[in-house]
Structure formats: structure tokens, C-alpha cells
UniProtKB/Swiss-Prot annotation:
Biological processes annotated in GO: lysyl-tRNA aminoacylation
Highest taxon, organism lineage: Bacteria
Organism from which the protein derives: Shewanella frigidimarina (strain NCIMB 400)
Gene: lysS
Cross-referenced Gene3D superfamilies: Bira Bifunctional Protein, Domain 2, Nucleic acid-binding proteins
Record-given protein name: Lysine--tRNA ligase
Chain residues that bind Mg(2+) 1: 410, 417
Swiss-Prot/TrEMBL keywords: Aminoacyl-tRNA synthetase, ATP-binding, Cytoplasm, Ligase, Magnesium, Metal-binding, Nucleotide-binding, Protein biosynthesis
Catalyses which reaction(s): tRNA(Lys) + L-lysine + ATP = L-lysyl-tRNA(Lys) + AMP + diphosphate
GO MF annotation list: ATP binding; lysine-tRNA ligase activity; magnesium ion binding; tRNA binding
Taxon lineage: Bacteria, Pseudomonadati, Pseudomonadota, Gammaproteobacteria, Alteromonadales
Main location: cytoplasm
SUBUNIT field: Homodimer.
Amino acid sequence: MTEHVQDENKLIAERRAKLEHIRTNCPANAHPNTWQRSHKAAELQAQYGEQTKEALEELAFQTSIAGRVMAKRGPFLVIQDVSGRIQAYAGKPVQGDLKERYQGLDIGDIIGVKGQLHLSGKGDLYVNMEEYQLLTKALRPLPEKFHGLTDQETRYRQRYVDLIVNEDSRNAFIMRSKVVAAIRNFMVKKEFMEVETPMMHVIPGGASARPFVTHHNALDMAMYLRIAPELYLKRLVVGGFERVFEINRNFRNEGLSPRHNPEFTMMEFYMAYADYKDLMDLTEEMLGSIAQELLGSTSMPYGEETVEFGGAYARLSMLEAIQKYNPDNATIQAMTYEQVKDVEFMRDLASSLGIKLEKFWTCGQLLEEIFGETAETKLMQPTFITGYPADISPLARRNDNNDFITDRFEFFIGGREVANGFSELNDAEDQDNRFKAQVDAKDAGDDEAMFYDADYITALEHGLPPTAGQGIGIDRLVMLFTNTHTIRDVILFPAMRPQA
């Protein structure tokens, strides 16, 4: 057993003994539930922080606070609640039983304090401890006692401790909540209706991904956690709800990375009588307004870059982006869509770029892999990439001028995809054929190919109006707004392998 563990175990034993003493001598004080808080720390700081010492003395303002003890320096305590920190002072008036109980306080305990508000000689607000109650005894010490909570894995496994001691972590999740609220408000103002669609699907669909499989006992059948809500949302558009959106979780049985968590949050929306260009315009308006609302600016730092959310964003086709970021590759510079349609040409090109090939890859998949390998990470500023091939866009409408590609875009910021949108395929016969092609791809070994959904075809046969739809990755968007570079830092409880 290490010295660190021995010291921690000793402290835990001491704290348990203190709690047992309270239970024995005054059981009602072990875990009381009657304390009434009148103010949060930030409220007191905002209302009285600018007062002079003399003015506060004359005011004789009484308050009741509650929170966690974060520091204990002689007669002063630093108490933290959800809004911030404030001090409490246990001076000469603290005598007898109150003094004894104060001396038994440990860092991490949750307490309530009542008393008059004062200003210290250093200009800090504090509450004079005229009444005090231990509300919860913390049996484990906070990690500052043991060199701080610096281990990333421990931060993710014990997020509750991370939130107690790391202000940056708390602020990131506060910002996440604000981003989601701002998106929801924006959509409602644009007359979108928020809906909820099934989380368990009989047929997984709406995206190319490997699903999680579960079993419905009562129906004795396999079901799938949803990989996307798309097909259900478009059924609602068929039903006459012309603008719908949903903010909820998707599940994809794939790997973990700084950009991927198997359980993640998406905002997906659909609007009738619109196309993919309308979606790009709406995205520019949405992100610019949200950045201004939450940050007070349309510019924000991200790593060593400054991302600009104001104004119009760059728009490039996938082929144009590949050519832009491979200026010295003569083959790429001369490449045309006719060559992109040649699978042997594309396999040779991808191989020459060091890309490990899969036998079942189509021309579109090869083009996407080349884009991902040579261009994607260079898209730091907000950029719409258009011209996605039809064979990797089974739900998107074909382009009128080039049926090899679709009216689809993906939206990139900070070198990663944040959103995906397109004019929806509303030709039931074309959709039927594309679903069948996906089944063939799955049979050829593509685990992420889509399933055939006969009921969705039936819905399309009732008539889907011209529609555009988009999904925005909330987690990746929050990474930008919080200047963090791993998705685990913006998911409260990310997926982790169980500890042995």
C-alpha cells in the first residue's frame, strides 16, 4: 500500500469517527434537511460587493448561506455553492458547542451559516458565523489534499469530484447548457416544433453506422438503439408538420476517440419547402447569433486559431477542397468527376496517398477517404463542403446538374465535422433502389451500411414535400464554445472501460 493511500485511509477513518460522534451525541444533526438558504454567493457578491465596510456595518444585513467548505484558514472558511464562493468568519462570538463543532469541520463538508454580512480589511465579503449547522459530513477528502485532480481518467470517472474542484470544468458544462438553450430558442423563434421520436428502433436507420442491439422481452424481438432520428422526423413532415426539430441522444457502436463517444447529442431538424442552400444560410445565422449571445462576439479562440462565426462561411465542393489542399499533386489537380467515377483510378490514387483500402469501398467512399486524409483537418474556419457522392448519401436528393453527387453538405470547424445536411430524397422509387444498394453493401462487408426500411418507403409513397434536413453535433459544437479538444471534456459521464 502506497503512502498516499495510507494517508487518505487515515483521513477517511478520522472523518468517519467524527460522523459517528455526531450520530451518538446528537442524531438529528447527522444529516439534517431543514436548513433554509436565503442567498447564493454570487447574489451577495453582486448586491453588496461594492459596498464600503462602513456602509455594510450600518446596513446590518443578515443572510443565510449554504455550500461546501473549500478552505479553512484559522477562523475563516471559504464556502462554495453553485454560483461561486464566499467566506464565513468564526470569530470571538463562536464559543462553547458551536466552537467545538467548528473545530471538527473538514474540507469538503457541506454546511449552512447564518449571520451578518461584513467586508474584510482586504475588501472581501464574509458572513459572521452567528449560527452554523453541518448539513453533510464528507467522508472522503477532496483531491487538493493529494496534489490535485490532474489525472484525466480520474476526472472522467469521478466527474462529481472534478466538478467540485475544477472551475473550468464547471464552466464548460454551464456553457453546454447555455448552448443547448440558445439553439432551442433559435429554432422556436424560426417556428420549428420540438418533437420526440423513438430511441429504440425495429430497423436502425437515418445514418451509416453500426448500431447497438438490445432485446425487447415482452415482444421477444431484437431492437436497436437509434443511430439517428432522421427517418421518423421525415415521417412527421409527410404527416404535415412542416418544421420539426429534436435535441436528443444517438448511439453508435463504434470506437472512442477525442472526437467520438458512442453516446452523443444531436440536434436534428427538417423544414419543408427548402433546400440545402437554405440550410447553409440558416446555419450561418444560427451560429453567428448564438456566439454573439453567449460570448458577446462572433469571434472565439480555438487552440491557436481564432474562429469567426460572423458573416458568410466558405463553401467548397469535396473535389475542390481536395484540390485546394493538395496543390503539388498533379494527378489531383487534373482530376475530374469522370475520373472520380472510375473505381480503379480512385483506388490507385488513394493507395498512392497511403490510405489503407477496403475491398467494398465505392468511388464515393474513396473520394471521401481522400478528403478526410488530405483536407478535413485543415478546415479550421467555418466551411461548408458540398458535392457528396450519391453512393455515400443514400437519403439525399441527387444534384440536378450532376447525378453522381447530391445536394448535400457537411459543415466543418476546427478541422472536424460539426453538421451534416442535405435536400431530402423524396422520390420513393429512387429511395427504394438506394436502400437495396445499401443492403448489397452490407452483404459485401460494410457493417455501417443502412438497412432496408419498407415502412419509410411507404411513407414516401404518401408524398414528402420538397424538404431539407440537418443534424448538428452538440458535443462538438460545445467543444468549440469552450475551447476544448476532446469530446470527453464536454460530456458529463463519457463512456469508459470498467476498472478492474
